[in-house]
């Protein structure tokens, strides 16, 4: 049930991949990394962009280890270790297990990978997430240019907890941060992550207790309970931005309480690593720039576009993001999102609406002009 739900969410989110990723449905392109150009180092497969692993990893000083065609793939750079298990369709980065089960229909090997002419490729979106890449496509030159993103000096440990208590099973993963930043700031952030994860488990335990009570009542009345006898929790995190002393993360809390389907609550936090302050949208924008009207129009127009293309059905008309909307930072912009049922049906999942930094560069608070400048890129 959980995997099916997450797959549905991800299918919706794939709509949001930058348009240049869908410029070609199939075909090879050149890959430029630094001063090196690799012929056919990039490839579109059914509209999804793949990058050849070896030249990208070499450019970023990662070592690629692959014993044979059917074995795990390991990417290593110092203490940074990424294990890709194509057969198991699993990726683990420094102890953090990423959910990529939804990728299997599109990949020839699984785990976001495909093999072409004895060369190993990986999905650009996944590889960017794992290694921190800035990927630009030039259709005219038939070239994909990859640069590394210079990220915050920050150690990220994954705290994992697997539970099995009565009717409840739970898998919980959340980040623990350390590094050359304010100890108080890091303590504040880590406390929030732990508290949010603990609350998810508490919610799962309550769901389990409620289900046990329902089953007991049914039995006492001489009836058998016909529903699922299981509750589950899947709590995970996704780091969206870690540059310029800013840290933006999304926490996902999936709960299944024995009904027809589960539900997911997505929570995002954006922090200033120097102070530990949680930043709101208003912190990033000039007060009198008209940003609220501009952003409301951008989101409204995108909703209309998706509805027109029959990719989305709107239950409740969207009017405004409000004064304190849910958002997170990404490498390219600010992404706004809505919870399940907030405006759209359950099947639509959590809809996300990215707005590029370029489009709001004149509205940004000068203190955060770095967001639109993209200065922190490797040569």
Predicted segments, located by residue:
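Hydrophobic alpha-helical segments and their boundary regions
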Residues: 7, 12-13, 36-37, 84, ...
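Ser/Thr-rich, low-complexity intrinsically disordered terminal regions
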Residues: 72-78
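Signal peptide-directed extracytoplasmic domains
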Residues: 78-108
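Sec-dependent N-terminal signal peptides of Gram-positive bacterial secreted proteins and lipoproteins
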Residues: 2-25
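Compositionally biased intrinsically disordered regions enriched in Thr/Gly
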Residues: 24-27, 32-50, 55-72, 97-379
């Amino acid at each position: 049930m959980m995997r099916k739900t997450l797959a549905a969410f991800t299918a919706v989110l794939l709509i949001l991949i930058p348009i240049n990723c869908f410029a070609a449905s199939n075909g090879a392109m050149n890959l430029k990394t630094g001063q090196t150009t690799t012929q056919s180092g990039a490839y579109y497969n059914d509209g999804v962009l793949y990058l050849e692993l070896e030249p990208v990893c070499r450019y970023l000083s990662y070592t690629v280890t692959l014993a044979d065609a059917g074995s795990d793939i390991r990417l290593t750079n110092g203490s940074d270790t990424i294990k890709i298990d194509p057969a198991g369709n699993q990726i683990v980065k420094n102890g953090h297990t990423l959910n990529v089960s939804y990728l299997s229909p599109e990949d020839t090997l699984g785990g976001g990978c495909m093999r072409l002419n004895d060369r190993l490729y990986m999905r650009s979106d996944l590889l960017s997430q794992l290694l921190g890449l800035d990927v630009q496509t030039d259709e005219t030159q038939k070239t994909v240019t990859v640069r590394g993103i210079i990220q915050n000096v920050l150690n990220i440990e994954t705290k994992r907890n697997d539970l099995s208590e009565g009717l409840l099973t739970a898998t919980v993963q959340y980040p623990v941060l350390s590094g050359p930043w304010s100890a108080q700031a890091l303590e504040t952030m880590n406390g929030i992550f732990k508290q949010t994860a603990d609350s998810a488990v508490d919610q799962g335990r309550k769901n389990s207790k409620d289900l046990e009570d329902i089953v007991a009542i049914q039995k006492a009345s001489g009836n058998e309970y016909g529903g699922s006898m299981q509750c589950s929790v899947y709590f995970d995190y996704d780091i969206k931005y870690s540059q310029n002393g800013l840290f933006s993360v999304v926490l996902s809390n999936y709960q299944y309480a024995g009904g027809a389907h589960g539900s997911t609550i997505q929570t995002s936090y954006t922090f200033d690593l120097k102070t530990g302050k949680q930043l709101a949208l208003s912190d990033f924008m000039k007060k009198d720039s008209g940003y609220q009207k501009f952003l409301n129009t951008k989101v409204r127009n995108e909703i209309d576009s998706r509805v027109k293309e029959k990719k989305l059905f709107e239950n409740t008309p969207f009017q405004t993001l409000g004064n304190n909307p849910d958002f997170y930072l990404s490498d390219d912009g600010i992404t706004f999102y809505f919870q399940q049922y907030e405006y759209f049906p359950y099947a639509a999942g959590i809809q996300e609406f990215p707005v590029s930094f370029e489009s709001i560069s004149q509205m940004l608070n000068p203190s955060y002009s770095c967001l639109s400048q993209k200065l922190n890129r490797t040569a």
